[in-house]
């Protein structure tokens, strides 16, 4: 990455702090290859500067501003919130594989990595837990 494209150290530091905190909260690990983690963290920091939000750097967006407004790929993305699956490999199992246990059977992540168990099923999956609770409570009047 050339120096002019490098995000500010403040945004890099902000995203490192976020990544560490979210990994702890979600019961995941940061990728054991620090180079992978650094690349993703810098990509998130770069998107903060470009679109004002930490948009997932592992996707191509024809219109990053429009994608940021949709919020589905803001870190932690919808897939992480619902299935605890990070296709960027930022939030992974201790051995560096993405957690696939909660993915639908036909999801590309399950096909690519097989079944990778969730080391801490009691943590993370915030969106999935809300949906499960609402389903258990039944319809509201």
Residues covered by each model-derived region:
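Long, distal/terminal scaffolding or interaction modules
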Residues: 2-135
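Intrinsic disorder/low-complexity segments
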Residues: 139-140
């Amino acid at each position: 990455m050339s120096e002019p494209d490098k995000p500010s150290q403040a945004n890099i530091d902000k995203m490192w702090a976020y990544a560490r905190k979210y990994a702890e909260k979600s019961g995941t690990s940061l990728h054991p290859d620090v180079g992978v983690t650094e690349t993703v963290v810098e990509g998130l920091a770069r998107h903060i500067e470009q679109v004002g939000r930490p948009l997932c750097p592992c996707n191509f967006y024809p219109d990053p501003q429009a994608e940021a407004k949709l919020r589905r790929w803001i870190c932690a993305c919808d897939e992480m919130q619902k299935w605890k699956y990070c296709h960027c490999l930022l939030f992974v199992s201790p051995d560096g594989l993405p957690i696939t246990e909660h993915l639908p059977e036909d999801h590309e992540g399950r096909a690519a990595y097989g079944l990778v168990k969730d080391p801490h099923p009691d943590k993370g999956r915030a969106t999935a837990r809300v949906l499960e609770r609402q389903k258990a409570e039944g319809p509201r009047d």
